Amino acid sequence: MVMSPGSLLLVFLLSLDVIPPTLAQDNYRYIKFLTQHYDAKPTGRDYRYCESMMKKRKLTSPCKEVNTFIHDTKNNIKAICGENGRPYGVNFRISNSRFQVTTCTHKGGSPRPPCQYNAFKDFRYIVIACEDGWPVHFDESFISP
């Protein structure tokens, strides 16, 4: 028995209601957060690291002005949305512990590649926005003392 394209579409649409959309692999905003800000095992953490990572993560078209990479496990970062974080401002959470981070700052000039970056290594509290218990946004404006 051959199913028509319309029947296949109907079966697919019905199956969407059965599979929970909150799974991490289906959470587009969480995946985007990881792509932009997660690097568990960095190497170098200097300007070459920034230029390489920004290019690899496709954050250079145009050159992104500032981006921070968090160097820890996904579980520890996710825990900020729960027991390892507390409310901060209106829609954010601040970590209860410090995280190793590298902040890459565009040196200026043309917003088009090749992009050149400075690197700033730090160990600080971080502020993120969470959605349904998943990190979805990193607050670049917060830098702890």
Swiss-Prot record:
EC number per UniProt: 3.1.27.-
Post-translational modification Pyrrolidone carboxylic acid, affected residues: 25
Compartments in which it is found: Cytoplasmic vesicle, Secretory vesicle lumen; Secreted; Nucleus, Nucleolus
SUPFAM superfamilies linked: RNase A-like
Family named by the database record: Belongs to the pancreatic ribonuclease family.
Known function: Has low ribonuclease activity (in vitro).
UniProt-annotated catalytic positions: 37 (proton acceptor), 137 (proton donor)
Free-text activity regulation comment from the record: Divalent metal ions, such as Cu2+ and Zn2+, may inhibit the ribonucleolytic activity.
Record-linked Gene3D superfamilies: Ribonuclease A-like domain
Cystine pairings recorded for this chain: 50-104, 63-115, 81-130
Renumbered ranges of motif Nucleolar localization signal: 55-59
Binding of Zn(2+), residues: 65, 106
Any one GO molecular-function label of the UniProt entry: endonuclease activity
Signal sequence, renumbered to the chain: 1-24
Identification of the protein by name: Angiogenin-3
PROSITE patterns, per the entry: RNASE_PANCREATIC (PS00127)
One GO process term, biological-process aspect: cell differentiation
Pfam families xref list: RnaseA
Main subcellular localisation: cytoplasm
Critical for catalytic activity (site feature) positions: 64
GO cellular component, as recorded: cytoplasmic vesicle; extracellular region; nucleolus
UniProt keyword list: Angiogenesis, Cytoplasmic vesicle, Developmental protein, Differentiation, Disulfide bond, DNA-binding, Endonuclease, Hydrolase, Metal-binding, Nuclease, Nucleus, Protein synthesis inhibitor, Pyrrolidone carboxylic acid, Secreted, Signal, Zinc
